[in-house]
Regions:
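Hydrophobic alpha-helical segments, chiefly the membrane-spanning helices
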Residues: 143-145
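N-terminal nicking endonuclease/strand-transfer module with a His-rich metal-binding environment
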Residues: 1-135, 139
């Protein structure tokens, strides 16, 4: 999926009232400190990272995390879940934006980021590719939340 596609999907949900911007990291922010509801500004937040390395085949990260419905996490806890997950996966210093979706029976979050750092280096996806390791941050998140 392209960065534009990942952001457009989430911003369409925001415009429809079935999602909201929950948090962000290293994003162009509004006066309240949240990522802007202007998709153009979100695209600009990622631009330098993508321009630093045009050779990476899949530079976009679009993650969905779905806590159990009975957990009923607050917005603050969902934002914390996203932050801890991104840290554990090695993307904690990347720009990312977290959306809360309420368009299904289970409230869940989507995280959009890029896999290239500021210097143009591809962030290792070895942690992502190992099912054992992928389940570790998720399992830790389940225990924590």
């Amino acid at each position: 999926m392209s960065l534009y596609g990942a952001l457009a999907y989430n911003y369409e949900k925001v415009a429809a009232g079935t999602a909201e911007i929950l948090s962000g990291n290293r994003m162009i922010s509004d006066r309240l400190g949240l990522p802007s509801e202007d998709m153009r500004l979100a695209l600009l937040s990622f631009e330098n990272y993508l321009l630093a390395n045009r050779n990476t085949e899949k530079p976009v990260l679009h993650i969905s995390l779905s806590p159990a419905p009975e957990d009923r996490l607050t917005d603050g806890r969902l934002a914390e879940l996203a932050e801890r997950y991104m840290q554990k996966m090695g993307y904690g210093n990347q720009p990312y934006i977290t959306y809360k979706h309420a368009d299904t029976h289970n409230t869940h979050i989507h995280i959009v980021s890029v896999c290239v750092d500021e210097q143009g280096k591809k962030i290792s996806d070895a942690y992502e590719l190992s099912l054992i390791h992928i389940s570790e941050p998720t399992r830790h998140a389940q225990i924590s939340y």
